[in-house]
Amino acid sequence: LQYLLLFLLAVTLTAQHAPRSKPVTQAEVDRITREAILIDTHDDVTSRTVDGYDIAKPNTRGQTDLPRMKGFLGAEFFAVYVDASYVKDNHSANRALQMIDTVRTDIVAAHPNDFVLATTADDIIHAHEQHKIAALMGIEGGHAIEDSLRLLRDYYALGVRYMTLTHFNTNNWADAQGDATDPKVLHHGGLTPFGKDVVREMNRLGMMVDISHTADAT
């Protein structure tokens, strides 16, 4: 206890005599955010643009619109979100392709002065130099590949650069945390052999493996 009291006293005295940092001005904040490349790694606004929402208009129901993105945002990973309901009747790939198309068509092509499609780090830097927002894509939910490495490669060719192995639902090759305690769900104890093939292929392609939502075993 004696040593603890001495330690606390030393910390207190040090804090009292530490030089005060000068307040940061708004101009400094603007300079840093203008020079740095700020990257948002997940944005679900695509679930609205796919239904006709124009990202250039103020968004009163969400947090993303072009006027706010112009506040020094450098790059945006738009979510290729595929709800688990699309697994039924094998509609996951159809939905994924629609979500990819809304990024390429409704966002990038519709606003060429503000966005540029990016698939590499160099693309992001080049977009920053042009004072444009780099638009990237990440799939949310590995069921989007419909158990096909060919589809995975197709998504990569279309510009997808990361994929969450699962969303809230366990798929045919990876366990999710969202239904980990559901006795009605068939779990695999992590990744199946095919699931490991998916990860290996993602590594080979250069697609980031996102483990958000996955079970610990996965």
Residue ranges and their predicted role:
Residues 2-12:
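Bacterial N-terminal signal peptides
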Residues 14-15, 66, 214-218:
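Short, intrinsically disordered, charge-balanced linker/junction segments flanking boundaries
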Residues 16-186:
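N-terminal hydrophobic targeting/anchoring segments and the immediately downstream early-domain regions
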Residues 147-157, 179-218:
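Histidine/acidic residue-rich metal-binding segments in metalloenzymes
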